[in-house]
Swiss-Prot record:
It comes from Escherichia coli (strain K12). Keywords: Membrane, Transmembrane, Transmembrane helix. It is a single-pass membrane protein. NCBIfam families: membrane_YoaI. This is Uncharacterized protein YoaI.
Length: 34
């Protein structure tokens, strides 16, 4: 079962989640050092 749509959705969701985590961590780091 090689579902291309599912794979693409998973990649997009993973990328979005990773970007959100990086943004949150950077904001916390800036507020902590500030």
């Amino acid at each position: 079962m090689n579902d291309q749509m599912f794979v693409e959705t998973l990649i997009i969701t993973s990328s979005f989640f990773a970007i959100a985590v990086v943004l949150v961590l950077s904001v916390l780091l800036i507020e902590r050092t500030g």
